[in-house]
Regions:
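Glycine/proline-enriched, intrinsically flexible loops and inter-domain linkers
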Residues: 1-743
Length: 743
């Protein structure tokens, strides 16, 4: 290989590598010498925000991460939660925002590939994917291109690897015009006593590279993901990785076969920072060192330097440590699966990673300095000035409407509320036959083979709420995920998060981050949900324009009996419809307010955590006692949209409903406001007394408001008709709107 270590390191070169001159000076002081060019590249990626979490670690320590079910919390490739019967759920959510904006198809595809590897690296077979996507305004010049590229990338990679994409969310807002968000979640199952960790243990044990060959794609991907965009962002296209889902499928099967052996010591995928990160992190977790010989690495391109080889983020690559003497067994297994593989190093008893190229030393660095040496930056925080302007709603902007049909139709046609079938029909959501029900209900539900159990999955964040109040906005994200799980018949058992924010060097952005993490931590503690894994994505801004704070959360819930699985749509004519929870006069951050006066203002809806918990517990108990037929949470678009969706989302036969509501707040607030902790349920009239008695016994606000039947949605408020619309027309609007924007 060519060697680039003769390059003289100047202040400009240091800054181009994303390090400050102070950080570079500290590296020299701790090393006792100036790093060479290849070593500079290693510090560049390992001390980047993407890998080191240097701006966020201080705050992340405040999240609850332990619990009786937690088998592995943050710090490994994914979190692991016990679900009983010797089985554990392995899950995580990750971002691939910057690459997906530059090259949407490959950026999104490799985001899927990376999160799959995080799961099967732990020894689990991936069984479900979800995604949380954010795009700019629907009429923005790049939105259609970006949406189509991202959806195609996700669907192609997931479909080819045979892992179903079972749910997710997609939102549009001008704040994402310059930075889209692509957050991907994956769930796997594993025997609870067969968890594999990313540790390079056992002095003298061989280190084996396997998977695809190494090329120049993705070099400095981690550093690129740790800086903001500007007008030259298109020039960063070469830093986007290129994925091969068929190679990933081979990798999955090879790894799961490998892990049946008792001589696998530790294993990790090569994700951000590639071979560099996997080598240093595996040594760091084990308290060992590694000697690595780069000439043994399978290469796709000739003439690559050690710098390029170490920083390449070519996809579908893994590093495994096996027991000494088992090298040939491992290599034979990889050959069977047609994967490139080679012994590239061994574990040492030094605290160093030493890297050679044809025997010539090119890197000699202390593991601890590289892995943990980046200082925790408790950056300054400042409450944003914009909040003084936006935290007020002038109710005089919109007079109380006399009729609600046109408003409801506008809401159902909004790309943020419209049915997402155009997206999920491109995904194979039934492969492996574990998915219970079609996408589109409150949570996806996946059966656990070999038992009666199932897992419910939900991902959520309302970034407008977080823009207006990041503390309560993050709490609402947690609460809605938990509510979605309850509506589907599950108990929440674990959470993973993806914290998407702007430039942390801006004190106002750090204030948003601090508030969001604090709010999330308080909500998780209250609901007794451990945060077992996650990801932080900073610098999501272009030319100084930051995205709204978007702390996305995904919650996994457990159904002890999959017969508890409940969906959102009305089932039978004559069933009664009831509302659980309280409605207040709240418009802040709502889709209604945005559509009617094109403003994002006010404060998020009030969230009473105790009421939220009571509402969830009542809903879950009614489901488990088989008292109710449907359950649907009220979120974007409020009660009116929840009612409409309950009427029209039935996959075969939409049903009408007639409602009569007594209200002490404005009509539009009751129907289109987004008061929290409300669930719409339907049930047979024969269960009315039992349902009412349970609500009264648990002291939860509850009211029967109508009945299922007919071919129209009819809503009377205080004795006056407010909405009358045929459900067939509502379904046509709701079902076809998204495709008109992005199809």
């Amino acid at each position: 290989m060519k060697n680039s270590n003769s390059i003289t390191i100047t202040p400009d070169i240091v800054r181009q590598h994303g390090l400050t001159l102070e950080e570079f000076g500290r590296i020299g002081d701790l090393l006792g010498r100036e790093p060479n060019f290849t070593e500079l590249g290693i510090f560049s990626v390992m001390w980047s925000e993407h890998c080191s979490y240097k701006s966020s670690r201080y705050y992340l320590k405040k999240l609850p991460t332990t619990g009786p079910r937690v088998l592995q919390g943050p710090g490994e490739n994914a979190g692991v939660v016990d679900i009983g019967d010797g089985v554990a759920a392995v899950f995580k959510i990750e971002s691939h925002n910057h690459p997906s904006f530059i090259e949407p198809r490959q950026g999104a595809a490799t985001g899927v590939g990376g999160i799959l590897r995080d799961i099967f690296t732990m020894g689990a077979r991936p069984i479900a994917l979800m995604n949380s996507l954010r795009f700019g305004a629907p009429d923005h010049s790049r939105t259609r291109f970006l949406v189509n590229g991202v959806v195609d990338g996700i669907s192609n990679y997931g479909n080819c690897t045979g892992v179903p994409t079972v749910g997710g969310e997609i939102y549009f807002d001008p704040c994402y015009n310059g930075n889209i968000l692509v957050n991907v979640f994956c769930l796997g199952l594993i025997p609870s006593d067969k968890i594999f960790l990313g540790k390079a243990s056992g002095v003298g044990n061989p280190v084996i590279y396997f998977g695809s060959k190494t090329g120049r794609d993705g070099i400095h991907g981690a550093s690129m993901a740790s800086s903001e965009f500007d007008e030259s962002s298109e020039e960063k296209r070469p830093t986007v990785q290129v994925g091969d889902p068929f190679a990933e499928k081979l990798l999955i099967e090879a790894c799961l076969e490998l892990m049946k052996e008792d001589w696998v010591v530790g294993i990790q995928d090569m994700g951000a920072a590639g071979l560099t990160c996997s080598t240093f992190e595996m040594a760091g977790r084990a308290g060992t060192g590694i000697d690595l010989e780069l000439s043994k690495v399978p290469m796709r391109e000739a003439g690559m330097t050690p710098y390029e080889t170490l920083l390449s983020e070519s996809q579908e690559r893994m590093l495994v440590v096996v027991s000494k003497g088992m090298e040939q067994n491992a290599l034979a297994l990889f050959d069977k699966w047609d994967l490139d593989a080679a012994v590239v190093g061994e574990v040492t008893d030094t605290p160093m990673v030493r890297i050679f190229d044809n025997g010539n030393p090119v890197v000699n660095l202390p593991v601890e300095l590289v892995v943990d040496g980046a200082l925790d930056l408790k950056r300054p925080t400042k409450k944003p000035e914009y909040l003084k302007e936006v935290n007020h709603v002038d109710l005089g902007l919109i007079s109380e409407p006399a009729r609600g049909e046109e408003i409801l139709k506008k809401l159902l046609s909004s790309p943020n509320i419209a049915n997402k079938h155009w997206v999920y029909e491109q995904f194979d959501h039934m492969v492996r036959l574990n998915t219970l029900g079609l996408p589109g209900s409150d949570a996806a539900v996946i059966r656990v083979k070999g038992s009666q159990k199932a897992l419910a999955l939900s991902v959520d964040c309302n970034s407008r709420y977080c823009y207006l109040d990041p503390f309560h906005g993050a709490q609402i994200a947690v609460a809605e995920c938990v509510r979605n799980i309850a509506c589907s018949g599950g108990d929440p058992i674990g959470l993973t998060n993806c914290l998407n924010f702007g430039n942390p060097e801006n004190p106002e952005i750090m204030w948003q981050f601090e508030q969001a993490v604090s709010g999330m931590g308080e909500a998780c503690t209250f609901f007794d949900i451990p945060v077992v894994s996650g990801n932080v994505s900073l610098y999501n801004e272009t030319s100084g324009e930051a995205i709204y704070p978007t702390p996305t959360v995904a919650v996994v819930g457990l159904l002890e009996d999959r017969s508890f699985h409940t969906t959102q749509w009305f089932k039978e004519d004559g069933d009664l419809v009831a509302l659980i929870g309280l409605t207040m006069e709240e418009f802040g951050g709502s889709e209604y307010w945005k559509i009617m006066c094109d403003r994002v203002e006010g404060k998020p809806p009030h969230l009473d955590l105790r009421l939220a918990q009571s509402v969830n517990k009542l809903c879950l108990e009614l489901i488990q006692k088989k008292f109710i037929a449907s359950a649907h949470d009220c979120s974007e678009g409020g009660l009116a949209v929840a009612l409409a969706e309950s009427c029209i989302s039935h996959p075969i036969a939409p049903k009408g409903a007639t409602l009569s509501i007594d209200s002490t707040v404005r009509n539009d607030a009751f129907l289109f406001g987004e008061s929290q902790s409300r669930i719409l349920i339907s049930f047979s009239a024969k269960n009315k007394l039992a349902v009412e008695a349970k609500a009264k016994a648990m002291d939860v606000p509850f009211a029967v408001i109508g009945k299922v039947g007919g071919d129209s949605l009819v809503v009377d408020i205080n004795g006056k008709e407010f909405i009358r619309e045929e459900v067939s027309h509502l379904k046509e609007l709701w079902f076809g709107a998204l495709e008109t924007y992005v199809g």
